A protein has these predicted regions:
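Compact, glycine-rich, soluble single-domain proteins
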Residues: 2, 6-62
Length: 62
C-alpha cells in the first residue's frame, strides 16, 4: 500500500494527525486530508516535509 500517515510537529515531536492518508489538497487557507475509508479532516497549517519512502507527511500549524 502507498498511503501515508500525517503528523503534526508539536513541541519538537511528531504527533499522529491521520493514518492511511490517500488524498491531500489545499482548500482555501486549509489543507484537506482524506483517508482510504473516505474520512476527511481539515488542517490549518502547511506541509513542512513529504517523506515519500517513509510514507510520512509532516505538517506544521499556522
Amino acid at each position: 500500500m502507498c498511503e501515508a500517515n500525517a503528523y503534526i510537529i508539536k513541541d519538537g515531536k511528531e504527533e499522529l494527525f491521520m493514518q492511511n492518508v490517500d488524498k491531500l489538497a489545499p482548500d482555501g487557507d486549509m489543507l484537506l486530508l482524506e483517508d482510504i475509508f473516505g474520512e476527511k479532516k481539515y488542517f490549518k497549517g502547511y506541509i513542512k516535509e513529504l517523506a515519500l519512502v517513509e510514507h510520512k507527511v509532516i505538517l506544521v500549524e499556522n
